[in-house]
Amino acid sequence: IIDQPNLMIKIPATKAGLPAITEVIAAGISVNVTLIFALTRYAEVIDAYQAGIEKCANPKSVHSVASFFVSRVDSAVDKLLNDDSLKGKAAIANARLAYELYLEKFKNFPHNHQRPLWASTGVKDPAYRSTMYVDSLIAPNTVNTMPPSTLDAVIAAVIEAEDTITPNIQSAKDELLALAALGIDLNKITDELEADGVDKFMTSWDVLLDAVEAEIQKAK
């Protein structure tokens, strides 16, 4: 048993995962809720976390992050666009509105906040600025996990730690409306991204189990 206070277990933000989040948080176990793409699902994740921590015997000991996947949204949306001016906009706009939802839902919440975590923040399109998903998503109480190459780019860029989300929430709404006007169904896209993410997780889990079983057999 690792038994470290900063350890979190991962639970995917699927419909089936929501009650598990509540139950595990209520049991006093810290959780990284992962594979979040849609704002509607993020709202359900927050509700699941808050329901769990309200039942927890020692809520001060429990922490959680909600991992909102960023660059995959742009990868899916951009290939549907002919309008270059809207390429590279969907993911950041989506994340900024997620932060607005975080502020609303936790405004008067008395226990530890479930912090938004920006995941998948390495750019997939080489035409984009390498720090785009970092310097565009800075705000209090957020976390950003990034690959080493992106971290190196951030260090080299000497990015100022100023809020780049809340001043741009209205523009984020405008960008998503513009995408919807072009027929981009973001809900459909995020549903597909979630399903694909779960498939990848299951494949990784099966590979891990096979590797563990192989080592057990070797040790016999």
Task: Indicate residue ranges for each PLM-predicted region.
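Short catalytic-loop micro-motif centered on adjacent basic/acidic residues
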Residues: L7-I11, V31-L35, K188
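Catalytic cores of alpha/beta
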Residues: L18-I25, E44, S130
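Catalytic alpha/beta core domains of metabolic enzymes, predominantly
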Residues: S30-S149
